[in-house]
Amino acid sequence: GYDPYSSSKGCADLLATSYRNSYFNINEYKKTHNTLLATCRAGNVIGGGDWAKDRLITDIMISVSQGKKVSIRNPKATRPWQHVLEPLSGYLQIGQKLLEEKVEFAEAWNFGPSDEGSITVEEVVQNVKKHWDKIDYEINQDPNQLHEANLLKLDCTKANTILKWKDVWDS
């Protein structure tokens, strides 16, 4: 990836794959080790309990509760938004397969929304505003702001075809 965020995701997967191949190779399962290692990646997860800094829904809630405008960094950026329960269902499927000792599932997996579920930051704000009219926002025009990719999406073809997993809720 061009920016540190997307590069960090790729690096994490590469590191996990390297670790799996070196120490928990599936060809050596039950011979030299008893560990199956899979990695799972989700889209931009929203849902209860996420109060981390620079999270869109969190920023909206905090700004409204303080009577402030929400500052939007990149309104035209498209993200793979999904409720926390969506990827969790995929994670549980992978966990079940690993518990069943199905070594072919010890790989990297993506769990994200369909292409139709990827909408812009501004569309998310507008959707929330439809249900909570107290929301007012402004576009952050900071010229020193760090680079962010305009489009993030996940290829979930493997999860869709092999696990028959798909997202249920729309954005």
Segments from the language model and where they lie:
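Conserved protein kinase catalytic core
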Residues: 47
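A generic local structural motif
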Residues: 26, 57-58, 137-139
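Active-site Tyr-X1-5-Lys
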Residues: 2-38, 64-66
